[in-house]
Amino acid sequence: MLSPQKTRFRKQHRGRMKGISYRGNNICFGKYGLKALEPAWITPRQIEAGRRAITRKFRRGGKIWVRVFPDKPVTVRSSETRMGSGKGSHKYFVAVVKPGLILYEIGGVTENIAKRAILIAASKMPMQTQFIISG
């Protein structure tokens, strides 16, 4: 699973996912991509599930670029805990996704195969996405 080797701080504020993505919203490496249309948090398991779905569809050939990385720590309080007594313990990392961000890029395959692979990966994502072609 994806997670940062080191973090500067162990815990972070939740923050708000307002606005659109101004960075990482263009296709840079491949020819086809999967673009987010809604804000969401994506877990490493969801990223890996999407990547595996794409590679399975390729069989041989083609290249995948994963453009998101989970770097935000999420804390969880144990159930039936009273209010107060500090922030919960670290549970997992998430990638913060804003509308317009490219999640995956694909190259070296035909448009038909790329579209099928991307649509399968899109079904694993927790938000609305769109298949896009560079050009």
Swiss-Prot record:
Part of the 50S ribosomal subunit. SUPFAM superfamilies: Ribosomal protein L16p/L10e. Keywords: Plastid, Ribonucleoprotein, Ribosomal protein. It comes from Epifagus virginiana (Beechdrops). Gene3D superfamilies: Ribosomal protein L10e/L16 (3.90.1170.10). GO terms for molecular function: rRNA binding; structural constituent of ribosome. The keyword Ribosomal protein applies. The lineage of its organism: Eukaryota, Viridiplantae, Streptophyta, Embryophyta, Tracheophyta. Transmembrane segments: none annotated. One of its GO terms (biological process) is mitochondrial translation. Its main location: plastid. It is found in: Plastid. This is Large ribosomal subunit protein uL16c. The gene is rpl16. It holds the Pfam family Ribosomal_L16. The keyword RNA-binding does not apply.
